[in-house]
Amino acid sequence: MTGCDTPLPPRPQDPAAPLPPLPEDPRPDTVRPPLTWLYVPGDRPEVVAKALGSGADVVIVDLEDAVAPDRKEYARAATAELLGDPVTAAPDAVPVHVRVHGEDDVLALAELPGLAAFRLPKITHAVSVHHVAAVAPGVPLYPLLESALAIEHAYSIASAHHAVHGIALGEADLRADLGIREDAGLDFSRGRVVVAARAAALPPPVQSVFPDVRDLDGLWTSCARGRALGMLGRAAIHPRQLEVIERAYLPTAREVEEAERIVAASAVEKGALALPDGRFVDAAVVASARRTLALAGRA
C-alpha cells in the first residue's frame, strides 16, 4: 500500500461508548495512613532494631545506596534473618519494607514472612515492574522514580501492575540527572508523580528524604511545601526527623474542627449542602474532611 492508502489505526475509545468507571479512592476515610518512613542501612542490624522501636510508621531496610559493595551479601543475609523472625512477621509489628539492590535481593527475600513490601530503585519503565512482580508474586511494590525518563513514564509505571501500591521520587539522583540546584526546581516532578499516582488510583506519594538531619526548621518548611503539592508523609534518615514530619503532615486543630463540622453537617443533610458561613459542600469536600479526621485519629 502507498502511504495515503494505509488504514488509520482504530480509535482508542468509541465516543458513543460509555466511559469506564473512575477508580475507587484508595484512601479509606477511616484509616490513618502511614506518615513516617524511616530508612536504615541493611548491614547494621543494631540500627535496624532501634528503628523498629523508633515510632516510625514504616521501617525501610536499605540494601542499595546505604550499603557498601563489599557489604551487600552480609546486608542481605542480615535482612533475611530479620524478615524470618516471627516477631517481625507479627500482625501488630511495624511494617518492614526493603529497598533492594538487585534481583538477588528479590529472590532471597520475597517469600519471608516479615517482608511487607519491596521498594524498587531507579525504575524507568513499566517492564521492570512486571519482571519483579513475576519473580515475587504477591509482594507489594513501590517503584522509585529517579531520572528524567522515569518522570516521563510516571503514569505507566504507577499503573503497570496491581502489585504496585505506591510510587515515590528519588530526589538526589533526579536532581543530578536534571542538573537542578534549587529545591523549587523539583516541584514539576513532584507534581507529576502526585498526578500519576492519583490517576492510577494509588495513595498520594511520600516525600523524598530531607538530607540535613540537623536542620529541623528546613525540614518543616520542606514538608509544608510537599503537603501543598499533594504529597502525604515523608521518608526520613534519622529518628529525630520523625516528630517534625508527623506534625507537618497531621492536620491542625483548626483543620480538625472544620472537618468535624463538615462531617456532622453531612450526617444531617444528605447531598450538597451549604454551611452556616455560606460555603458550598459536596461529596468530595465531605470525603476530604473524613480523611482529615482519619489523619487526626478522630475517625
Regions found by a protein language model. Give the residues of each.
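Expand to "…catalyze enediolate/carbanion chemistry for C-C bond making/breaking, isomerization
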Residues: 2-299
